[in-house]
């Protein structure tokens, strides 16, 4: 009986060693085109929730959501990215670390930030330091993690 228990434990050990808590960064980021869902404040980063900035319960919120949900971001496996926003596109680079879930995004050139929504988008991207999510939902947050931008695939 004792020998049997030891054998079972030895059989389980390789599975325990193979566990990996590191994210597959490419699977998450480079899984297609991402679209903004909303911006969130009063965030509880660990519980993945917050207070949506734009709400469909009023005309101003509906108009903002109509605009920002068309903003897109495509992360490519080679570390480049392409984004779309109101009246323009931009390119840049990205880098993420799956172990500590950090992200760094650089926007090349001078993207069109003449609209408040464009500026908000670019600022959220360039200030992002942390990410969480999977191949369906992606959240990017600044250092304090008190707010975040959330993306989804259409």
What are the roles of these predicted feature ranges?
Residues 17-154:
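Lipid interaction determinants
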């Amino acid at each position: 009986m004792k020998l049997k228990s030891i054998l079972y434990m030895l059989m389980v050990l390789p599975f325990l060693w193979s566990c990996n808590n590191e994210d597959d960064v490419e699977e998450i980021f480079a899984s297609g085109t991402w679209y903004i869902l909303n911006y969130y404040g009063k965030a509880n980063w660990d519980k993945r929730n917050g207070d949506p900035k734009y709400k469909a319960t009023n005309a101003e919120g509906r108009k903002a959501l109509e605009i920002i949900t068309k903003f897109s971001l495509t992360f490519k496996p080679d570390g480049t990215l392409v984004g779309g926003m109101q009246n323009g596109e931009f390119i840049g680079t990205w880098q993420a670390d799956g172990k500590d879930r950090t992200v760094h995004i650089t926007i090349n050139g001078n993207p069109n930030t003449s609209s408040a929504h464009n500026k908000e988008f670019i600022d959220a991207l360039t200030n992002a330091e942390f990410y969480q999510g999977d191949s369906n939902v992606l959240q990017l947050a600044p250092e304090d993690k008190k707010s975040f931008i959330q993306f989804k695939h259409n």
